[in-house]
């Protein structure tokens, strides 16, 4: 499911809750909310903060050391520089949902 499909899913899911007394929201509202959450997670991790959403999972940064590697085309040795890797660790509720528990 890509972002556009997910926004449509959020909107349809919102209409499902309308019957339970909740207000529905538009695709524009869903896109704005999703963008705000994603931008907030990116900003927090960029500033070296981890984001923990209980049950869902945690977003963070892992530092990777520089290391030796090889150019796949030429086979020549090369140094792969150190870098920071974004990471996500799934929480218990997400794991349970994926395993139909």
Curated annotation (Swiss-Prot):
Disulfide feature: none
Xref: PROSITE patterns: HISTONE_LIKE
Similarity remark: Belongs to the bacterial histone-like protein family.
Listed PANTHER family: DNA-BINDING PROTEIN HU, DNA-BINDING PROTEIN HU-BETA
GO molecular function (one): structural constituent of chromatin
Role noted for this protein: Histone-like DNA-binding protein which is capable of wrapping DNA to stabilize it, and thus to prevent its denaturation under extreme environmental conditions.
Source species: Rickettsia bellii (strain RML369-C)
Record keyword DNA-binding present: yes
Domain of life of the native organism: Bacteria
GO cellular component: cytosol
GO BP: chromosome condensation
Keywords for this protein: DNA condensation, DNA-binding
Complex and partners: Homodimer.
Record protein name field: DNA-binding protein HU
């Amino acid at each position: 499911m890509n972002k556009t499909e997910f926004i449509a899913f959020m909107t349809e899911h919102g209409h499902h809750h309308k019957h339970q007394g909740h207000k529905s929201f538009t695709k524009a509202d869903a896109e704005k909310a999703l963008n705000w959450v994603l931008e907030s997670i990116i900003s927090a991790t960029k500033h070296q903060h981890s984001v923990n959403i209980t049950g869902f999972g945690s977003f963070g940064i892992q530092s990777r050391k520089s290391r030796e590697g090889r150019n796949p085309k030429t086979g020549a040795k090369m140094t792969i520089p150190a870098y920071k890797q974004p990471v996500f660790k799934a929480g218990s509720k997400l794991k349970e949902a994926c395993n139909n528990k």
